[in-house]
């Protein structure tokens, strides 16, 4: 058996939800005028309050104008907040994470992860996770731009990249660019042709 749903003429929600709109008094007046059974079911005998509000609303249009102004301000604030969130999301999606492999002494190297501060990731916690997951030394340091980066000892750039991809995907940032740079590769010397000394 289907039940007919009544929608409020003031806030356009079912009367059960009118109390969440901030227009409860006007909603009660509308419901009392249009569906007294439902009004009695929801609010009981609240007739005196409804009559008082109806009289005041009938006498003064300032209440409606003020309510409309407040509603417009609220809509503007919501639109601003939404656009701010969209800009923040676009900034996060357009930023990139750089995983740089750098040479240390002899054949040792380290991996530096930069660009994660945009995604509100706790760097110290991430460093501890890397240290325990990869069984290696790991620390947080600041680069020349005064931004934090995670320094991991060892040649584990691929494993770190896979972990960061999974971490960003978990946060809902699947389209973020993760770039791997190998600064440890030595430039090959171009062979120079030397002429043997004349004998």
Swiss-Prot record:
Name under which the protein is recorded: Translation machinery-associated protein 22
Keyword Ribosomal protein: yes
Domain notes: The SUI1 domain may be involved in RNA binding.
Keywords: Cytoplasm, Ribonucleoprotein, Ribosomal protein
Superkingdom of this protein's organism: Eukaryota
Annotated ranges, domain SUI1: 97-168
Family per record: Belongs to the DENR family.
Primary localization: cytoplasm
InterPro entries: DENR/SUI1_TIF, DENR_C, DENR_eukaryotes, DENR_N, SUI1, SUI1_dom_sf
Entry-linked PROSITE patterns: SUI1
GO molecular function: translation initiation factor activity
GO BP term (any one): ribosome disassembly
Organism: Eremothecium gossypii (strain ATCC 10895 / CBS 109.51 / FGSC 9923 / NRRL Y-1056) (Yeast)
Keyword Cytoplasm annotated: yes
One Gene Ontology term, aspect cellular component: ribonucleoprotein complex
Cell location: Cytoplasm
Subunit comment: Interacts with the 40S ribosomal subunit.
């Amino acid at each position: 058996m289907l039940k007919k749903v009544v929608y409020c003429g003031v806030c356009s929600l079912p009367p059960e939800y009118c109390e969440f709109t901030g227009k409860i008094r006007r909603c009660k007046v509308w419901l009392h005028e249009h569906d007294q059974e439902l009004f009695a079911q929801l609010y009981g005998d609240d007739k005196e309050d409804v009559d008082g509000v109806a009289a005041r609303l009938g006498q003064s249009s300032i209440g409606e104008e003020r309510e409309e102004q407040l509603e417009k301000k609220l809509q503007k604030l919501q639109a601003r907040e939404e656009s701010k969130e969209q800009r923040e999301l676009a900034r996060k999606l357009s930023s990139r994470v750089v995983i740089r492999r750098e040479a240390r002494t002899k054949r040792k190297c380290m991996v530096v992860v930069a660009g994660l501060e945009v995604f509100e990731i706790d760097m110290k916690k991430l460093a501890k996770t890397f240290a325990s997951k990869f069984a290696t030394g790991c620390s947080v340091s600041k680069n020349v731009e005064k931004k934090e980066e995670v320094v991991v000892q060892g040649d584990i750039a691929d494993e770190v990249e896979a972990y960061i991809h999974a971490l960003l995907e978990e946060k809902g940032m699947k389209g973020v660019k993760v770039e791997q740079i190998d600064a440890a590769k030595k430039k090959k010397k171009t062979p120079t042709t030397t002429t043997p000394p004349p004998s």
